[in-house]
């Protein structure tokens, strides 16, 4: 039978406790969410600064629609590039210290577009082993040779680059904050390796922008560098900024090259101008409202302190992403379901998103949480682990 693999692979996923399905959330993204008529404390959202449903942004989207309409009407090189797109790219350049910026519909499409555009069969792509799926998949289907270095292992990275000295075009990619582990890349060491071996460095800062660094400028700035010190800096607007879409930055020449040669950019309808106006307002709030980061940092420290007290097996992270390592996929599902029954929305992350044997609860904190939320959550996690003998 044609395409029989579809049913076979779905059955296999279910047997391995790896099957997934979307769950519809009623209402707004917030501290509490509603699913099937029941309310849950939400510890699975990437809305780190609590902006996704902020009234200021809701009104900004409405105002953007009044000013610019809803749809962009075309691709960026035809009629889809509104003045608001231009203004927001300028705003991002000034806020983040970037030379040039181009907008994309999503971080996934931005990463896929860049790797496809820049690398050919004679080139080398080197990635951190646990980079985001958008980066790994793009590398796998690229004509370039791809090698992956052990997570944050600069010695391994150096040995790979040293073995490829005669390759002219070398691109090293790392996430700034790793989406499933929550730890950060050693940006200075990465830059040093790339400089020494004449390679370009790209940082995907989807989970660092808005949260880390002075004025929320991200992971690179948090580590005492400038965003312009890396060859390519990209990030998204759908995490800390609470909206959606993404951007890529680099030299003016690189952005000009994307404008002229990147098919995913050229042949995609531009981001809705009302949405882009809202992104601009979100960027302003992320830059200026330091209290959101201060509150989030305090909650992160509190969660880590309580988890240590209750001997909960956290992975090493100082960011809003706090993974609780469980191990087996069925065990992670059991703990997640236990917490849902107690009124906490937590997500079990399983292979192939993470390595076999490293299934986990991906706890994410936001500035909207209260200390008492965390106190109850940590106690329930402890009870869930004890009840299931993990």
Residue ranges and their predicted role:
Residues 215, 221-257:
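Active-site PLP attachment segment
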Residues 147, 151-203:
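Active-site phosphate-binding strand-loop segment of PLP-dependent enzymes
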Residues 114-133, 154:
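Conserved PLP-anchoring active-site segment centered on the Schiff-base-forming lysine
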Residues 1-94, 192-198, 329, 359, ...:
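N-terminal glycine-rich, Lys/His-bearing helix-loop that initiates the first secondary-structure elements
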Residues 270-289, 308-309:
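Structural motif of enzymes handling amino- and sulfur-group chemistry
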């Amino acid at each position: 039978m044609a395409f029989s693999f579809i049913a076979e692979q779905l059955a296999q996923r279910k047997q391995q406790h790896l099957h997934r399905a979307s769950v519809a959330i009623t209402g707004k993204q917030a501290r509490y969410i509603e699913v099937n008529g029941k309310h849950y404390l939400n510890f699975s959202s990437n809305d780190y600064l609590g902006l996704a449903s902020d009234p200021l942004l809701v009104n900004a989207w409405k105002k953007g629609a009044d000013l610019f309409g809803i749809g962009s009407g075309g691709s960026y090189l035809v009629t889809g590039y509104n003045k608001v797109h231009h203004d927001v790219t300028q705003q991002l350049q000034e806020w983040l210290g970037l030379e040039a910026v181009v907008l994309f519909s999503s971080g996934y499409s931005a990463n896929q577009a860049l790797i496809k555009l820049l690398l050919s069969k004679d080139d080398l792509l080197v990635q951190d082993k646990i980079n985001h799926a958008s980066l790994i998949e793009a590398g796998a289907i690229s004509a370039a040779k791809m090698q992956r270095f052990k997570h944050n292992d600069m010695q391994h990275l150096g040995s790979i680059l040293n073995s490829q000295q005669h390759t002219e075009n070398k691109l090293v990619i790392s996430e700034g904050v790793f989406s499933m582990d929550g730890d950060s890349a050693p940006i200075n060491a990465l830059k040093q390796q790339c400089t020494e071996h004449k390679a370009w460095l790209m940082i995907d800062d989807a989970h660092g922008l808005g949260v880390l660094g002075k004025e929320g400028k991200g992971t690179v700035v948090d580590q005492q560098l400038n965003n312009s010190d890396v060859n390519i800096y990209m990030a998204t607007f759908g995490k800390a900024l609470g909206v959606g879409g993404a951007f890529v930055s680099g030299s003016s020449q690189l952005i000009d090259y994307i404008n002229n040669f990147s098919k995913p950019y050229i042949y995609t309808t531009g981001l809705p101008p009302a949405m882009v106006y809202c992104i601009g307002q979100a960027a302003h709030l992320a830059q200026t409202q330091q209290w959101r980061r201060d509150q989030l940092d305090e909650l992160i420290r509190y969660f880590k302190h309580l988890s240590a007290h209750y001997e909960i097996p956290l992975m090493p992270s100082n960011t809003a992403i706090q993974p609780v390592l469980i191990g087996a996929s069925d065990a992670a599902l059991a703990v997640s379901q236990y917490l849902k029954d107690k009124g906490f929305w937590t997500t079990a992350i399983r292979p192939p998103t993470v390595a076999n044997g490293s299934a986990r609860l991906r706890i994410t904190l936001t500035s909207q949480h209260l200390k008492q939320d965390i106190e109850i959550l940590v106690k329930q996690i402890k009870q869930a682990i004890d009840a299931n003998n993990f």
